[in-house]
A protein has these predicted regions:
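Substrate-recognition element of Asp-dependent hydrolases with the DxDx(T/V) motif
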Residues: 38-71, 75, 84-96, 135
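Non-catalytic pre-domain segments flanking phosphatase-related domains
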Residues: 1-9, 17, 85, 169-184
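Active-site neighborhood of HAD-like aspartate-dependent phosphohydrolases
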Residues: 1-51
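Conserved Lys-Pro-Asp/Glu-containing loop-to-beta segment of HAD-superfamily phosphomonoesterases
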Residues: 99-130
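Acidic, Mg2+-coordinating phosphoryl-transfer loop and its flanking beta/alpha structural elements
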Residues: 125-162
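Structural recognition of alpha->loop->beta junctions
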Residues: 74-89, 94, 153-173
């Protein structure tokens, strides 16, 4: 049984830029500021056997603000700083109606199929309603970091915490559920 922690990127692993109350991705590697407790919190999860997989919407690719190469370079930078096993990227915008853009669970399902992950034994950590809904739709337990920017949530998180360290503590204290495997 492979367990995973799926992580949103912007606002969870690196600083999100909030403008008019909404979070935005950094535009350059120089703006990629890794949150202070990320490396230690993720190392603890990794030591306990969790696969660490980033699941990130990057609509600036579809909008023409960033190229896939620029986004990949930022992801490579993040991966050089943190113990990540994979980074799943949705390059689409809402109007593309794809299956991978959170709140749809496509990024999580794709990684679960490829990595043999038991979604019922896994977690999604995010800072927005999209992350929580994607996690619930995939069959994962969910953790909201922060206040969700005042957004309305259709699905409530299993835990609402302030930091990635608190999220790691909570995840590591959750029991392994029995007979609830979610085959992919």
């Amino acid at each position: 049984m492979t367990r995973a922690v799926f992580l949103d990127r912007d606002g969870v692993l690196n600083k999100a830029y909030v403008r008019n109350g909404k979070p935005y991705s950094p535009d350059t590697i120089s703006e990629m500021i890794v949150v202070p407790d990320a490396a230690e919190a993720l190392a603890r999860l990794h030591q306990h056997g969790f696969r660490l997989i980033v699941a990130t919407n990057q609509p600036d690719i579809a909008r023409g603000r960033l190229t896939r190469t620029e986004v990949d370079a930022m992801n490579d930078y993040l991966a050089s700083k943190l113990p990540l096993d994979a980074i799943e990227v949705c390059p689409h915008d809402d109007m593309d109606h794809c299956g991978c853009r959170k709140p749809k669970p496509g990024l999580l399902l794709q990684a679960a199929r490829r990595e043999g992950i038991d979604l019922a034994q896994s977690f999604m950590v995010g800072d927005r309603y999209r992350d929580i809904e994607a996690g619930h739709s995939a069959g994962c337990r969910t953790v909201l970091i922060g206040d969700g920017y005042g957004e309305t949530f259709k699905a409530q998180p299993d835990a609402t915490l302030n930091t990635l360290t608190e999220a790691a503590d909570w995840i590591l204290n959750q029991p392994v559920t029995k007979d609830q495997s979610c085959p992919v």
